Amino acid sequence: MERLRDVRERLQAWERAFRRQRGRRPSQDDVEAAPEETRALYREYRTLKRTTGQAGGGLRSSESLPAAAEEAPEPRCWGPHLNRAATKSPQSTPGRSRQGSVPDYGQRLKANLKGTLQAGPALGRRPWPLGRASSKASTPKPPGTGPVPSFAEKVSDEPPQLPEPQPRPGRLQHLQASLSQRLGSLDPGWLQRCHSEVPDFLGAPKACRPDLGSEESQLLIPGESAVLGPGAGSQGPEASAFQEVSIRVGSPQPSSSGGEKRRWNEEPWESPAQVQQESSQAGPPSEGAGAVAVEEDPPGEPVQAQPPQPCSSPSNPRYHGLSPSSQARAGKAEGTAPLHIFPRLARHDRGNYVRLNMKQKHYVRGRALRSRLLRKQAWKQKWRKKGECFGGGGATVTTKESCFLNEQFDHWAAQCPRPASEEDTDAVGPEPLVPSPQPVPEVPSLDPTVLPLYSLGPSGQLAETPAEVFQALEQLGHQAFRPGQERAVMRILSGISTLLVLPTGAGKSLCYQLPALLYSRRSPCLTLVVSPLLSLMDDQVSGLPPCLKAACIHSGMTRKQRESVLQKIRAAQVHVLMLTPEALVGAGGLPPAAQLPPVAFACIDEAHCLSQWSHNFRPCYLRVCKVLRERMGVHCFLGLTATATRRTASDVAQHLAVAEEPDLHGPAPVPTNLHLSVSMDRDTDQALLTLLQGKRFQNLDSIIIYCNRREDTERIAALLRTCLHAAWVPGSGGRAPKTTAEAYHAGMCSRERRRVQRAFMQGQLRVVVATVAFGMGLDRPDVRAVLHLGLPPSFESYVQAVGRAGRDGQPAHCHLFLQPQGEDLRELRRHVHADSTDFLAVKRLVQRVFPACTCTCTRPPSEQEGAVGGERPVPKYPPQEAEQLSHQAAPGPRRVCMGHERALPIQLTVQALDMPEEAIETLLCYLELHPHHWLELLATTYTHCRLNCPGGPAQLQALAHRCPPLAVCLAQQLPEDPGQGSSSVEFDMVKLVDSMGWELASVRRALCQLQWDHEPRTGVRRGTGVLVEFSELAFHLRSPGDLTAEEKDQICDFLYGRVQARERQALARLRRTFQAFHSVAFPSCGPCLEQQDEERSTRLKDLLGRYFEEEEGQEPGGMEDAQGPEPGQARLQDWEDQVRCDIRQFLSLRPEEKFSSRAVARIFHGIGSPCYPAQVYGQDRRFWRKYLHLSFHALVGLATEELLQVAR
């Protein structure tokens, strides 16, 4: 015993010295970092304490019990002998409810374990009404802290004791030693079962034991502390057994009113010196004051916690127990004035029923919910429950109808399905800085990949279509397959990527619905459908059969709607997920693949967008397949399109990794029941009215008119409403619609677009005047006519538009109004030239993407090949680009730089290069898909961060100690920087991430957590006043910095060559489209009023068929050649002098501007750009759109000569 006291005194002296030197108590890490002599003392202290406890109760009980027996206080008028607990109470029965109070548990504990050592009567019980328990479990414990010993262990093995003089050894010590010998001779298993039954009340899972200490469950007096058991002056086991459960009440306690949930901080351990110091605050310690420290675990030693017991009792879980947080606070209020908390009566389980006292009348006093307020509250509760159905989240505050452990409404806390290990983890640890999201149902562990449903034959052939496929076909509402559907479905079910080209209305959607249904039947999985338009997604979701559950994710959804959809996806309640390419590629669209069910296959609807829309319009299409393979682990793709030439099909097949097959195409691109006609009228508006009033179109009740510009849709719709309302006579089988014509374009709000489309689908609208945004995915079979006011941009667009008519097989009419002088062709050329750029702008972009660095580290060749700037297999490119890439696909040099994360602010880059954002992103995608893999394009992010501290520089420096990114940012600033002593700091997020080597999301999360802190006593989350702002959206990429000048020139040539090739192809496509329609056009619409011309219609269908069947390399060039100018253009020689004069005048009017030759040509053609917008330069009609009839490239040449002349 002397050795134990000596070791304890030496450890206390070391801890006091540590506290004086460091200003804080030593932690577990400090003990581990202490000298070997100190650590040896801690180990010896632990060993001596364990040996003493096993020998018969320890030093505390062997010395204090004789003093309690021999030095009993004399009876006085007032004293502890008058307490109610001093009277003998009947012993509790073994079958007492678990919901007894803490004193009741102490009574049973003493009766079983220390029955022979009792020095006083047992404690009595007093009925006490139960209060409401805490409705929120504690937060998870951070890593690195050891488990906290349970209260049952402390009471049973090492009971604490009040400071008292050490008595002399007496007879009671010998009785205790003999008792330990007798207990040692018994069966250990029987003893363990006896011990485990007694602390069963506290051995339940922590999540099922609400914290003791709420205002509703304790009787507290301000300024005093409450202890369970006898008074502070009593001696014996009663005082020692419950000394640790005293509660400090001097500070405000957390309340449960107003939706606030109680939380408590925990102390991981307390050293002997800490307990002695806290217990001696009320007065000078006595001789045995250090005895309390013997029972505490030394810092640095792990404590073994009891395994949690399952909460199997079906009774109400809101009983009063002792939580770990209450144990951590035990002993901190020792020495303060006592306030008794009386034991409480166990509550019988009545389920959800509450007994009402009907004998006493109660009246409402004060504010109450009556009439209007009561109805408003009921209305809020109703819509809160419906929030999930409309995309919103559930109630923000846990209500009494839900489980207070996981806030679910399908069970109570007693039947909570959460595992015991998770409950124990959630009940320990500090409050997180950022509130955690609402718990979602856990997805069962699934395989990362989905195996094909059917295997291939020995020679790679498809298996015969089994019966279950036809059964699923009937379940979807179809009796048989249409041409091309069965083979495509079997290929997907066999795991083979497929490109399916079918006419519009031929049932392409079934080819992904049927495989998705069969895959989901076998195992929980997900089918991704990438769709280009929101209206198309809405139409497809509404048209799905009931057996398929579908959901959408797009940019028009709110955050609550997106979270609701993601929660259903994680719970495997969605079979088909439709999303836009921007939602798939962009940041925040989908969670990581590990949090989602495995993807069976991915369907690219309107797959021709991969080839046509991906360049300078929607560059995300260029990265769709790459993201699906690398991020989502997709191996099987299905491409669906109705308009794809051989060239387009080959390009799409390359993206989808589909082997080329001779039967990629289905039937003819234009159905036989469509009657085509073309006319060239000078007054298009009057010709349209004449055609609609003619015999051929007069009785048609569903017509779609397509225009190239939004302004034309509004104007033509107003014209038709004025002129055709009284002239139109409905057909024999239909009734007159409510409205004659309405406009539809992308500039309208979504509600208005849905209204127009719904009216047209229901037959209440006869004519829709729209742009190409209308009709994609339209499922109305009886569209009788499709008209075009102007030249379509391509054959593919025309075929797709006319394919929306006559899907029911009945005759339908299609007419095209062509401008005789090629005015519409000029407008389409403007869009082509708007996407082109100069070589100088490309070179500036390359310099910004590949800045020089000073990397000196090398990497092994195996890592270099897969990193940025390494090599990878060369994909197949079109013939025009294959020759250009052939000399660039040679193996590059070994890279020294492994790549740096860089950010290009979008707005600044757009202004510096005078290029649209889509054009810049397209060039970056070209570099990412290059065989040399020049860079890795990441999701766009906000790069500029500003952090403002209201507490001044002192608070900023204090935050740097807890936030490593902020510390690195302050360390990188120059000492002479005047902002060093300010209360705010601004920095580049991406540069900071690149210098630290962290992930961008981790740095952003660490900076956002600086805005929140915890109240040190209650753990309630509170704001710190720190403001963290992110701004300046930027392209985020990773590129090497050690490229040579030759490599940069090679990249510039590659990018500029791709831009010129795309421009030539687009101009050639326009030229060929105009020539084809011009060859079959009538001079006016007169011959088309009564009946169609079958001969010209057949000729046009043959031209379209040959265009779609052409092989690669047969497409002619599109730039001006020696034969003459393009259609619709004048000769430059006739206008050269006037053009030069106008260029000089334009430059002289704006001498402060630094124009390029392309900028001057754009203004003369009426093409706006970021640096020269149409809103500013379009006001000067002397130059804007003046030379639209001349060649754009000819204007660029003349402007270059004049700029050089001015520079001289």
Swiss-Prot record:
One of its GO terms (biological process) is DNA replication. It is found in: Cytoplasm; Nucleus. Keywords: ATP-binding, Cataract, Craniosynostosis, Cytoplasm, Disease variant, DNA-binding, Dwarfism, Ectodermal dysplasia, Helicase, Hydrolase, Hypotrichosis, Isomerase, Metal-binding, Nucleotide-binding, Nucleus, Phosphoprotein, Zinc. Its cofactor is Zn(2+). It is an enzyme of class 5 (isomerase). It comes from the Eukaryota. Binds a Zn(2+) ion per subunit. It catalyses: Couples ATP hydrolysis with the unwinding of duplex DNA by translocating in the 3'-5' direction; ATP + H2O = ADP + phosphate + H(+). PROSITE patterns: HELICASE_ATP_BIND_1, HELICASE_CTER. Residues 17-180, 201-333, 860-888, 1111-1130 are annotated as: Disordered. The keyword Aminoacyl-tRNA synthetase does not apply. Gene3D superfamilies: 1.10.10.1460, P-loop containing nucleotide triphosphate hydrolases. It is linked to RAPADILINO syndrome: Disease characterized by radial and patellar aplasia or hypoplasia. Baller-Gerold syndrome: An autosomal recessive syndrome characterized by short stature, craniosynostosis, absent or hypoplastic radii, short and curved ulna, fused carpal bones and absent carpals, metacarpals and phalanges. Some patients manifest poikiloderma. Cases reported as Baller-Gerold syndrome have phenotypic overlap with several other disorders, including Saethre-Chotzen syndrome. Belongs to the helicase family. RecQ subfamily. NCBIfam families: recQ_fam. PANTHER family: ATP-DEPENDENT DNA HELICASE Q4, DNA HELICASE RECQ FAMILY MEMBER. This is ATP-dependent DNA helicase Q4.
